[in-house]
Amino acid sequence: MATYHHWTVGQALALFDKPLLELLFEAQQVHRQHFDPRQVQVSTLLSIKTGACPEDCKYCPQSSRYKTGLESERLMQVEQVLESAKKAKAAGSTRFCMGAAWKNPHERDMPYLVKMVEGVKALGMETCMTLGSLSKQQAHRLADAGLDYYNHNLDTSPEFYGSIITTRSYQERLDTLNEVRDAGIKVCSGGIVGLGETVRDRAGLLVQLANLPKPPESVPINMLVKVKGTPLENNAEVDAFEFIRTIAVARIMMPSSYVRLSAGREQMNEQTQAMCFMAGANSIFYGCKLLTTPNPDEDNDLQLFRKLGLNPQQTATSHGDREQQQALTEQLLHGDTAQFYNAAV
């Protein structure tokens, strides 16, 4: 059985304090011990239920408490979701992520969610969902349907968390991660840089993630996307080097996890993204929208991968992230593609 290092905040801060190039060198060494440095795993994302969320997350345009101009939508029909999944698969995707703006799914919605998972699995794709908090029974129902991954972010450190969210406790988030893991579903959990947190808070977040009974298989690191109408719309810009440091420290602390560039890539130039890959990021969401925030369009992603000589991974459903298939690689290296996913606006 694999053993994991138990990290302290002091140890994490010591990594953040290293000279940047020294930190990048260490992170790249760790990365090469566990992954092929030329491979980037690619996921697609669809918002299956948008807006009208009762939570008060200060960064989120989907909260019903803020006037952001986002139009709410009911849970999509199963057939609509499967049609989007088919289009994503035709474009080369092998993992389909479905997100719903809920505090938690209602029991009346569970049969539809189960059908979505079963339908996407029947297409030969990996499945991922982010639906808010889950009960033990809900986690097991989704696991029985074939759900591969569940995303539930911790967002920030326990100490800073109450400044950003009051409608869901930190412990609730940890409890959901435990239920997901106990049900046999792989865990996807990360956080956001740019909420107004300190470097100690970033260190605290990564310590929480790394010290879980088993670190998450995927760790999304988001850069705050400031949305007009949310309480954080006037937050200071995130320094690119500070974001890159966070990626590098995450790679060192969770050497076997996929570190994903998620929201905020639209704000990054090619050089920043390239340094994130050098720092150990090896997963992205691909296409024009990430739920309700901008994401670089697919043509820009294709061009960047070709410039950097990166082969995005296409994963085989039965073997997880590490299995390679050729279709997406060929698309990314040799030509443009149609829109990769249709995340809701």
Swiss-Prot record:
Protein name (Swiss-Prot/TrEMBL): Biotin synthase
Cofactor note: Binds 1 [4Fe-4S] cluster. The cluster is coordinated with 3 cysteines and an exchangeable S-adenosyl-L-methionine.
HAMAP family reported in the protein's UniProt record: BioB (MF_01694)
Binding, [2Fe-2S] cluster: 97, 128, 188, 260
Ranges for domain Radical SAM core: 38-256
Enzyme Commission number, as recorded: 2.8.1.6
Binding site for [4Fe-4S] cluster: 53, 57, 60
SUPFAM superfamilies according to UniProt: Radical SAM enzymes (SSF102114)
Entry similarity comment: Belongs to the radical SAM superfamily. Biotin synthase family.
Highest taxon of the lineage: Bacteria
Quaternary structure note: Homodimer.
Organism: Yersinia pseudotuberculosis serotype O:1b (strain IP 31758)
Source organism phylogeny: Bacteria, Pseudomonadati, Pseudomonadota, Gammaproteobacteria, Enterobacterales
EC class of the enzyme, as a word: transferase
A single GO BP: biotin biosynthetic process
GO MF entries: 2 iron, 2 sulfur cluster binding; 4 iron, 4 sulfur cluster binding; biotin synthase activity; iron ion binding
